């Protein structure tokens, strides 16, 4: 997917969360992207951030940076021994 499309989509998510309480905006954006974006889309937007992230609204940029800095932990490969 082209970066401009991802930027548009991410900013649309951000616009939705603008109506939430201020302390819920960035976490809400991050949670939505984490839950509903394919890992390839997330990796592409992370690379876009690394390249400057032009065009991303400030709360969207912050949410993506938070996601990038705190990667998901999958329990699929973790040891669950007793």
Language model regions located:
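Intrinsically disordered, low-complexity, basic-enriched segments
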Residues: 1-82
């Amino acid at each position: 997917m082209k970066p401009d499309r991802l930027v548009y989509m991410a900013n649309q998510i951000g616009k939705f969360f603008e109506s939430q309480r201020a302390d819920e905006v960035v976490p809400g954006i991050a949670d939505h992207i984490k839950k509903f974006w394919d890992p390839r889309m997330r990796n592409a937007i992370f690379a876009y951030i690394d390249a400057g992230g032009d065009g991303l609204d400030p709360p969207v940029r912050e949410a993506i940076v938070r996601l990038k800095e705190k990667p998901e932990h999958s329990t699929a490969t973790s040891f669950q021994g007793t």
